[in-house]
Regions:
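Acidic/polar loop patches that form or flank catalytic/metal-binding clefts of enzymes
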Residues: 78, 191-192
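GST-like fold's C-terminal all-alpha helical module
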Residues: 96-191
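Carbohydrate-binding/catalytic loop surfaces
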Residues: 197-202
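Phosphate-coordinating loops and pocket residues in cytosolic domains that bind phosphorylated ligands
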Residues: 42, 185, 194
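Conserved residues at the C-terminal ends of beta-strands
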Residues: 55, 154, 195
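GST-like domain detector, emphasizing the conserved glutathione-binding G-site
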Residues: 1-133, 139
Length: 202
């Protein structure tokens, strides 16, 4: 099994967290969209990373990759057992992809003028902060156990300070701050970090 992974891309990072949490034997080849072999990028009709190759199977959508890994390597499970809980988890992951990731991508790429970037940063902070109440009820992201939803959220939280976005030290946000420190301290998360990603918080 080989994962072609960008060195500091949050989409690649979420897959690396799954690999690390499950202790899956996988060769991680760090590259970029510009330097990845054409035969690898050709697996993905959108010609970008990450790309996961397992024998004759090539996967390019991170949601598909992560659920494939969870089914192929069922221990520890990263999706809830019951259908309703699984559906809720998938809805959360979809929300992150549709509402939070586009804002994060715009800020990372510096899309738009200074005013637009400032607005995107403010909207991103608002979206992230709105999640804080959930961590009063659950130890993890809407779950009692670490799951794929945490794998989606953790890479985003890790990148915020490097983008000039700091969660306020307020009573309302404290559950989220406590949560992120708990996640960042997990051996699986630490093992998932590339050298560039590790430097984001040094």
């Amino acid at each position: 099994m080989i994962l072609y992974s960008d060195k500091d891309d949050h989409y690649s990072h979420r897959v690396r967290i799954v690999l690390a949490e499950k202790d899956i034997a996988c060769e991680i080849r760090e590259t970029s969209n510009d330097d990845a072999p054409e035969e690898v990028l050709s697996i993905n009709p959108y010609h970008n990373l990450p790309v996961l190759i397992d024998r004759d199977l090539g996967l390019y959508n991170t949601s598909v990759m992560m659920e494939y890994l969870d089914e192929r390597f069922p221990h520890p499970p990263l999706l809830p057992v019951y259908p309703v809980a699984r559906a809720n988890s998938r809805s959360l992951m979809l929300r992150i992809n549709r509402e939070i990731c586009p804002l994060l991508n715009n800020v990372i790429l510096g899309k738009g003028n200074a005013k637009k970037i400032k607005e995107d940063k403010e909207n991103l902070l608002h979206e992230i902060s709105s999640l804080a109440p959930t961590f009063k009820e659950y130890p993890f992201f809407m779950n009692d156990e670490f799951s794929l939803t945490d794998c989606y959220l953790a890479p985003i939280l890790w990148r915020l300070p490097s983008l000039g976005i700091n969660l306020p030290l307020t009573k309302n946000i404290k559950p989220l701050l406590d949560y992120q420190e708990k996640i960042f301290d997990r051996p699986g998360f630490q093992d998932s970090l590339s050298i560039i990603e590790r430097d984001l918080r040094d």
